[in-house]
Amino acid sequence: MATQSTPATLPLHEKKPLVRRAAPDRSQRVRHIVQGAFLLLNGWLGAQFYLWVRYFERGGEGLYVSRPAGVEGWLPIAGLMNTKYFLSTGRIPAVHPAAMFLFLGFVGMSLFLKKSFCSWLCPVGTFSEFLAGVGRRVWGRVFRIPRWLDISLRGLKYLLLAFFTVFIGGMSAEALDGFMASPYGLMADVKMLNFFREMGTTAAIVIALLVVASTLVENFWCRYLCPYGALMGLVSLASPVKIRRDVEACIDCSKCAKACPAGLKVDQLVQIRSAECTACMACVASCPAENALQLALAPRRAETARERWARRGLRPAVVVAVIAYFFLGAVLFARATNHWKSDLSKAAYMELVPQTDQLSHPAVQEH
């Protein structure tokens, strides 16, 4: 993995006077509002999708609602497969195209604004934050595991990412098209829903263990096991936006390092390059000093005056605007080009949805 961060080369200073912020930081309030809104959106999509599935399971009886293509945001593997297909053929896939557009939107978000998808939008990330809060109330704290073990465990998500990318990367365009056009591929979204509706004992135990682990170690799933987050982190290494510290304005209180959910040594660095940084701005919110810490673009060579430092920092409203640009841009572009919904008839859904539990993975069928 790439170098985590850029260390400060300036010598340590004596205790410096505090120049307090002119205005309180509202980044966390704004972020929590965005998280809540996206959580509600996902809840609405999930409820609509459930009603849509039940209509076909009942043989066409009851209320019919349209299939919300936005649920394909929960199909990152389909999004990756469709992206590979698009890059190989130049054709937009007919099945689960929304998965690809949302995938590309989230990747673009990470390319410009670090892993902001993980800390501002992802429902799993939001739930993980909630569980960490539960842990602080129940256990009195969350725990930091030894650094050597932490680094080793973080490698797991990259191994999972490598498995998926190597497997999908080795598939031809014809194989990708065949998989997505198979009954299993067509019903990938319904399969996902049924996993939660008909969860087995083993899956329930694993999820329960992950929930408990997330109350003990902050963002346990995201930090150690999420391959989607691993991909976003690698992409985010190229982001021009980073957490940047003004060594002269910093009073060396270390509040930023204590606030960082990823456990990064923000107080010892000039800029944070780590793939673990999610641009959550918790460190910025914790900083009591005016302009000492910013989520900011790289300074221009000509910019040396302290007054320009503040102008480089991204305010929460700008962060929200960038996130909205990539998310809504992907959705609106797909809708405008008529590539948002899968090209599958109602009759086909009527045949396939009730049979979803009997559908096997194509690779299993071949054997």
Label each PLM-derived region with a short phrase.
Residues 1-258, 266-267, 275, 285, ...:
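Non-ligating segments of multi-cofactor redox enzymes
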Residues 278:
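Short alpha-helical catalytic segment bearing the HExxH-like zincin motif
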